Amino acid sequence: QSGPRGWLRFTVPYSIGIAWISPLLGAFHAQYPELRLDMHMSNDPVDLIGSEIDVALRVGTLPDSTLVARRLAGFRTQVFGSPDYISRHGEPLHPDELQHHRILAVRKHYHSHPSRITWPLTDGNGGTADFPINPLMVANDPSALLGAVLHGEGLTLATDVAAKPYVEEGALRRVLAGWTGPEVDFNAVFPRGRVMSPKVRAFVDFLVERLSSNADYMMVHCPSRCPMEAAAAAQLQAGEEVREGKRILEEVVG
């Protein structure tokens, strides 16, 4: 029985197409050799109803009510830098120190206040705060900053999946263990009411599997908490459970 065939036309933002999707297309084609791919890269919304595009891959919320989304993955953002930068400028141990470092920032990842620019970061206990940064460069697309970060120009807040290949080869290191930035939702978007074709379903299911695998890899190699913090938190929780057990026992006995 033959599988999906023909042309699959999809649109994706530039940086995501380059960093997230292109590395996966060889494996997808090996799995579905009868499918041909037409990738339209654009940072602008594409008219899915009036065009021949089968599916759009988009980041963030879905403001258009004529469209429906299937969530492909959710990616953490964390602070990364090159070993060269860290050896020359040191490693921040707390987000308060970021204002004294060279920062390369993506506009959608920071908050702009009247008198300062901040990164919203969450600690391992779920508490979120805005920490001042003094970016030497900002861009609307993370791929514009990645080359500079890899060459030791500064620190950046990036998604796990974008950083993964460079973490694997040792070109990037995560800093500020225990702190994460906003989570990025990645969705497959279709016109409401359109039946999903076999070729689109195959592509979407493939992306869910592969992107989840990448996210799982980074959860292991760059956990939200460093091992010492996680062990301390587990010990604290265990102590609280013991105390609660003693309290209940005392109430029963008393």
Residue ranges and their predicted role:
Residues 146-171:
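A ligand-binding cleft/hinge motif common to bilobed small-molecule-binding domains
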